[in-house]
Swiss-Prot record:
Keywords: Cytoplasm, Disulfide bond, FAD, Flavoprotein, NADP, Oxidoreductase, Redox-active center
Binding site for FAD: 36-43, 286-295
Organism: Haemophilus influenzae (strain ATCC 51907 / DSM 11121 / KW20 / Rd)
A single Gene Ontology CC term: cytoplasm
Necessary cofactors: FAD
Name of this chain's protein: Thioredoxin reductase
GO molecular function: thioredoxin-disulfide reductase (NADPH) activity
Length: 318
């Protein structure tokens, strides 16, 4: 373990919130240090197509957008550190953070650690993770070329995953516990076009009862009808779970005020909107937002957190 590194402002996370905070903080001469976390670029790097980022009307990829954000942050001399923070001590200043590679202290902290894919929680699902069960179609979809797969979920992510896989797999079985989908209309329209083409098969009013498999991996699913309770089996080679995300806040439990895992912020009308229950600690992006969860809103709160941190540090030095 190397010596402790001190930063005036430390930013945790390298998604839209973290990189935007870094850009604004660097331009304010705060000399931010950004710790990337395990997944550099965050969730967005697993998104194949983005068509609602202002200015990129021709459509862009998540990984491409995050690479440009990284370059933007580096242009203003943000120091990027490839490490993962596994423990923090926010009880006194400077704040202490303990990484896999290095330890840090800082005068102000912006938490932009994002969220991770949520799984259903079945033992059989856990047993086949990495052997047919995944939460990322763009990461693992190519393994299932011309093979049948399933997708579980009813929101934008599930429909996007199904549409992406429809261009790879032989058949995509989209499974949803309700009788209608919550996705945006443009995605629903594309979904039903693929249904008409026979590329996607809908299984509504169904829940996952069991992941079936053998020593080689997933071989199928057992579904339960939510109205009748009847069970049915599907033969397929892969399952993609798209039922939402959980905020990455485990290391902050007992140190910050949380609400269902999300960091509570002040959201004040007089500024300081991203301030947490600990003075000098700010939160941005999916780690504090359970309603909107968009790349653009994450970036916006990253900007707000940088401005809040700048005001806080200025007041400390006054």
């Amino acid at each position: 373990m190397s010596d402790i590194k001190h930063a005036k402002l430390l930013i945790l996370g390298s998604g839209p919130a973290g990189y935007t905070a870094a850009i604004y903080a660097a331009r304010a001469n705060l000399k931010p240090v950004l710790v990337t976390g395990l997944q550099q670029g965050g969730q967005l790097t697993t998104t194949d197509e983005i068509e609602n980022w202002p200015g990129d009307f021709e459509m862009t990829t998540g990984s491409g957008l995050m690479q440009r954000m990284l370059q933007h942050a580096e242009k203003f001399e943000t120091e990027i550190v490839f490490d993962h923070i596994n423990r923090v001590d926010l009880s006194s200043r400077p704040f202490k953070l303990f990484g896999d590679v290095q330890n840090f202290t800082c005068d102000a902290l912006i938490i932009a650690t994002g969220a991770s894919a949520r799984y259903i929680g079945l033992p059989s699902e856990e047993n086949y993770k990495g052997r047919g069960v995944s939460a990322c179609a763009t990461c693992d979809g190519f393994f299932y070329r011309n093979k049948p797969v399933g997708v579980i979920g009813g929101g934008n992510t599930a429909v996007e995953e199904a549409l992406y896989l429809a261009n790879i797999a032989s058949t995509v079985h989209l499974i949803h516990r309700r009788d209608s989908f919550r996705a945006e209309k443009i995605l629903i329209d594309r979904l039903y076009k693929k249904v008409e083409e026979g590329k996607i098969v809908l299984h509504t009013d169904r829940t996952l009862d069991e992941v079936l498999g053998d020593n080689m991996g997933v071989t199928g699913l057992r579904l339960a009808n939510t109205k009748t309770g009847e069970k049915e089996e599907l033969k397929l080679d892969g399952l993609f779970v798209a039922i939402g995300h959980s905020p990455n806040t485990e290391i902050f439990q007992g140190q910050l005020e949380l609400n269902n895992g999300y960091i509570v912020v002040k959201s004040g009308l007089d500024g300081n909107a991203t301030a947490t229950s600990v003075e000098g600690v700010f939160a941005a992006g999916d780690v504090m937002d359970h309603n909107y969860r968009q790349a653009i809103t994450s970036a916006g709160t990253g900007c707000m957190a940088a401005l809040d941190a700048e005001r806080y540090l200025d007041a400390q030095e006054a």
